[in-house]
Design a protein with these regions (language model features):
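Alpha-helix termini
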Residues: 30-40, 105-106, 112-113, 166-190, ...
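Active-site catalytic loop in hydrolytic enzyme cores
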Residues: 68-71, 81, 97-228, 232-233, ...
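Eukaryotic scaffold repeat domains enriched in small/polar residues
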Residues: 15, 89, 110-114, 296
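Residue-level recognition of beta-strand->loop/alpha-helix junctions
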Residues: 7-9, 48, 56, 139, ...
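CN hydrolase (nitrilase-like) catalytic-core segments centered on the catalytic cysteine
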Residues: 73-91, 204-342
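Active-site beta-strand/loop signature of hydrolases that rely on acidic residues for catalysis
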Residues: 29-65, 83, 90-91, 202, ...
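C-terminal helix/juxtamembrane-tail motif
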Residues: 355-365
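N-terminal glycine-/serine-/threonine-rich phosphate-binding loop
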Residues: 1-44, 64
Length: 365
């Protein structure tokens, strides 16, 4: 697969300016695709959480002018235009507003006893395919402190699961199944990949009160059979402005290691215990796209400045199970890193997951 992320240094409440930044990166990406000798095809482009509005809004009043109608605002229009231009799937995070239903109102009133409004608001990710048709409009399920004051919870992690079409054949694409549910090895692979999407805080414990080891989102990714996990993010860093000033081309590795740790369920071997091997190098079982933003956003209404971790990357999880006859009593997991941007860099992470990764780390389990 050929995957790109745009790591933007978005300015809060500057939709037009942020779109201009993204447009400039589209032009750069188009030139990169034409100049790499592999043709223009791109499978997926991912932008950060609330890419064009910015993220660090202190209240509903502050974010309200930037709420976009479901699948119909500037973010959705941009996604459709760029998807058609690049011939790829495009995912963009945006603040969504939509009318509430009677069922919504009754449910909310039953839970809270409060008067209900005639609108619902979500921190959302729209994913569109080359034709401009919406593949999924996912709504963030685990809200963070910043979006909790204005956004409603999305339905579930499962609502972000779908089959993503691919522009080019890939080693990770789907194998059609027969009536029993087993892979039909006599059929050609479908030009699509089982995919699940999430937004930033989704990989953390629910409200930071669920068990740390529950790893709800990663568990969903595993049980759903997803081969591609896409995360649109506005992930903060603990680094100071002074520390970040030296990290234009250096990723925030503490943040990266934490991200990887939240996918521990994907490290576990498949059911069945000891596996034999043909000796060939295995393909990664899951590919994860971390599409974060960079830069700082000053707070409004007394809210603290938000500093973002950048470090967008595309990685693979490759389980290397113990083979028959091995003396080692453990299994090993390899973390394949095709590319990673710096913590403060504004730019493009473009990778081909069928190529050799730039870095490989390992974890013993």
């Amino acid at each position: 697969m050929r995957i790109a992320t745009f790591q933007l240094r978005s300015r809060l409440a500057d939709v037009e300016g942020n779109i201009r930044k993204a447009d400039a990166l589209v032009g750069k990406l188009d030139r990169m695709l034409q100049g790499n000798g592999k043709g223009k095809n791109l499978d997926l482009l991912v932008l950060p959480e609330m890419a064009f509005s910015g993220y660090n809004f202190p209240s509903l009043k502050a974010v309200r002018p930037y709420l976009e109608p479901s699948e119909a605002g500037p973010s959705a229009r941009w996604a459709r235009t760029v998807a058609q231009k690049l011939g790829s799937v495009v995912a963009v995070g945006y603040p969504e507003i939509c009318p509430s239903t009677l069922q919504d109102n009754l449910s909310l009133h039953a839970k809270t006893g409060e008067d209900v409004q005639d609108e619902r608001r979500f921190n959302s990710l729209i994913v569109v395919k080359e034709s401009g048709e919406t593949l999924v409009n996912y709504r963030k399920h685990h809200l963070y402190y910043t979006d909790d004051p204005w956004a409603h919870e999305g339905e579930s992690h499962e609502s972000g699961f779908f089959s993503m079409p691919l522009s080019t054949p890939s080693k990770q694409q789907s194998i059609p199944k027969d009536d029993s549910g087993d892979a039909n090895v006599g059929c050609s692979p479908k030009n699509e990949i089982p995919t699940t999407v999430g937004i930033c805080m989704d990989i953390n414990p629910y409200k930071f009160i669920a068990s740390y080891s529950a790893c709800e989102f990663a568990t969903h990714a595993r049980t759903s059979g997803a081969k591609l996990v896409v995360l649109s993010m506005a992930w903060l860093t603990l680094l100071s402005s002074k520390e970040l000033s030296t990290m234009t081309d250096k990723p925030d590795m503490d943040t990266f290691q934490y991200w990887i740790s939240r996918f521990a369920p994907l490290f576990l071997p498949d059911e069945g215990g000891v596996e034999d091997s043909s000796g060939e190098v295995a393909e990664p079982q899951v590919i994860i796209v971390f599409a974060n933003r960079a830069g700082e956003e000053e707070g409004q209404e007394g809210k603290d400045t938000a500093r973002y971790a950048g470090s967008s990357c595309v990685v693979g999880i490759r389980r290397c199970p113990r083979k028959v006859g091995d003396d080692d009593d453990g299994n090993r997991v390899e973390i394949l890193i095709w590319d990673m941007l710096g913590a403060t860099e504004e730019g493009i992470c473009l990778v081909d997951t069928d190529s050799t990764p730039r870095m490989v780390g390992s974890v013993k389990i």
